[in-house]
Regions:
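P-loop NTPase nucleotide-binding/switch module
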Residues: 100-156, 163, 173-233, 248-251, ...
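Metallocofactor- and cofactor-centric catalytic cores in central/energy metabolism, strongly enriched
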Residues: 39, 48-51, 73, 135, ...
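P-loop NTPase catalytic core
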Residues: 224-228, 232-545, 555
Length: 589
């Protein structure tokens, strides 16, 4: 730590101006001393010998003349074994440790190490003495839950290094020296199991960045089939309050085809964060049968916490995600909600007296949001393995208005858009993703032709529904009315899904493809129906049989029996495949 000091010259909310001597750098961490209590802060602007710092705590009691200690370090996350299962605040203070230290009502100025320095880990060396290593290559492994946690050459080292010595297999703390590297100048560099990395710098210790192609299966039919997300891709879920964002997030984190889940609750209401903290330890991971928390990290900053630390929580979470990606793991980062982070940027921009953009958000809002989502990616690592960080950000636009700046800036950089609809959530159609406005640039688990065919039915049915609101059911032709019934059936049996049923919530790729083919056969047929009442009765019966089918185990005897019931009803309705549907089913297109 440097001896660089300064003194407070003005205070404006959580923005404090500090006069300093010596050298101070942007994003440097400093501590403002208030009645012998150090408050963690970050330098966000420098003018001459005045540094403007944002304080990560409540600033009551700060006065002109208070001393400030500059550390010479950036805001950093501690990386090493012991991160999984932790609940942190935005500055990587473990909340459980803070509660033990200070009780339930935290006083400002309390900080704790991100990783326990006392716990011992079983280290197994994998690199041989004399090996030539670079930053991002590993020297050994440590078991952490269900994963082998790799111990890396620290990412901040540059150049090549020779492994001079390494400890034998045994139990060590994260602070103990486990190896010594020799650099190109012959200097010895001791390394331990943990090191720090600045959260605002992306970790780039990979060989190549690849295009995200493999689909990240969420087991949510509407997402995987119609608006898929790729591993290493990005997506956003904007929607009004109460539209089902949190339940969709829980379902995704539980069933998604990823190794690690990181939840950044930045600026959400305290009630929602408490709900997440109480429910996640009780959620059972279907892969292991154990608690989902064993492969989860939660970073929480509620809306009642200081505004500045919301920004830190977003960067801390993505840094932890990149760290586990470096091990060849697939990580899903769920940021809830990026709107609150943007509001924190707006507040600081106002205090800095910058020229405001639309709705008083800073003019650089788009570049900040883009820089965050660009840290997602699918990468090839030095050892030949592949890892990914997939970022899913929820946006909470006021009144569900998707035209506001945060949503629009997000839409420009993400690869998939899952727009939640108040109308669908009020009608209890969950997940409430609106299929008419959502989109994705990634590859679906079903063929493109089948996906477009189903979307055409949905759009056609929506048009007929809009017309019926004006002219009534009597004013529509039988063919239009049947199209409307088909779209309603597709919505009810495929787009809607019960997140609380173990079978229906977990709908894998094979089942989605099988059910899609059966649906196209039913929806792509013409029937011997002459009255609208007959058509309504027929499709209501068909819909109920499909819904019952959804609740049966795939390829079980019950599944086959329910499928036989569907086929019998199809024959009863005198179904005849159209040319387009027949071609789709034959070609797989």
């Amino acid at each position: 730590m440097t001896e660089n000091k300064g003194k407070v010259v003005s205070v404006n909310g959580n923005l404090v101006s500090v006069e300093f001597t010596g050298n101070v750098s942007m994003n440097e961490i400093c501590f403002v001393n208030v009645d012998s209590t150090p408050l963690k802060s970050e330098v966000i602007r420098i003018k001459g010998n005045i540094a403007q710092v944002q304080v990560y705590e409540m600033t009551g009691g700060i006065k002109c003349g208070d001393t400030v200690d500059f550390t010479g370090e950036m805001l950093s996350a501690e990386l090493g074994p012991g991160l999984l299962g932790q609940v942190y605040d935005g500055l990587q203070n473990p909340l459980a440790a803070l509660a033990e230290k200070a009780g339930w009502f935290l006083e400002r100025g309390n900080y704790a190490d991100g990783l326990s320095g006392d716990k011992k880990w079983l280290f197994t060396p994998t690199a041989q003495v004399g090996a030539v290593l670079r930053a991002g290559e590993y020297v050994g492994t440590v078991p952490e839950g269900a994963f082998l946690h790799k111990i890396f050459v620290p990412f901040y080292l540059t150049g090549t290094f020779t492994l001079k010595s390494i400890v034998e297999k045994g139990e060590y703390t994260i602070k103990e020296e486990i190896a010594v590297l020799t650099d190109e100048r012959g200097r010895d560099i001791p390394i331990s199991m943990s090191f720090k990395w600045p959260v605002k710098r992306a970790i780039r210790c990979y060989s190549e960045r690849l295009a995200p192609e493999a689909t990240m299966e969420t087991k949510v039919r509407l997402v995987d089939s119609f608006f898929p997300v790729a591993k290493g891709g990005t997506y956003c879920t904007p929607g009004p309050f109460g539209a089902g964002k949190t339940v969709l997030q829980h379902t995704t984190s539980k069933y998604a085809d990823v190794d690690i889940v990181i939840i950044a609750a930045c600026g959400e209401r305290a009630g929602e964060v408490v709900e997440t903290l109480t429910e996640f330890p009780e959620l059972i991971d279907p892969k292991t049968g154990r608690s989902l928390m064993e492969r989860t990290i939660i970073i929480c900053n509620t809306s009642s916490m200081p505004v500045a630390s919301r920004e830190a929580s977003v960067y801390t979470s993505v840094t932890l995600a990149e760290y586990y990606r470096q091990m060849g793991l697939h990580v899903l980062l769920l940021a809830d909600s990026t709107s609150r982070w943007a509001q924190a940027l707006r507040e600081m921009s106002g205090r800095l007296e910058e020229i405001p953009g639309e709705e008083a958000f800073p003019a650089y809002l788009e570049s900040y949001i883009a820089a965050f989502y660009e840290r997602a990616g699918y990468v090839l690592l030095p050892d030949g393995s592949k890892g990914s960080v997939t970022i899913g950000g929820t946006v909470s636009p006021a009144g569900g208005n998707f035209e506001e700046p945060v949503t629009q800036a997000t839409l420009k950089v993400v690869g998939a858009f899952h727009g939640l609809s108040r109308e669908r959530s009020d009608a209890r159609k969950y997940p409430a993703i609106d299929p008419l406005i959502s989109w994705s640039k990634y590859k679906s688990v079903i063929s493109r032709g089948k996906m477009e065919y189903c979307k055409a039915i949905l759009h056609g049915g929506s048009d007929v529904n809009a017309m019926m609101k004006v002219v009534g059911e009597e004013g529509t032709t039988l063919s239009d009315y049947i199209l409307y019934l088909k779209s309603e059936m597709l919505d009810a049996v495929y787009l809607q899904q019960n997140s609380f049923d173990l079978i229906d919530a977990n709908c894998g790729t094979l089942r989605q493809r099988y059910v899609t083919d059966k649906l196209i056969k039913v929806l792509g047929s013409e029937y011997g129906l002459v009255l609208k009442d007959d058509a309504r009765a027929f499709f209501n019966r068909m819909r109920q049989r499909f819904i019952d089918w959804n609740y049966t185990e795939f390829e079980s005897q019950d599944f086959k029996d329910k499928e036989r019931d569907i086929d019998d009803l199809y024959k009863e309705g005198e179904g005849r495949l159209t040319v387009d549907a027949e071609r789709l089913l034959k070609d797989g297109e």
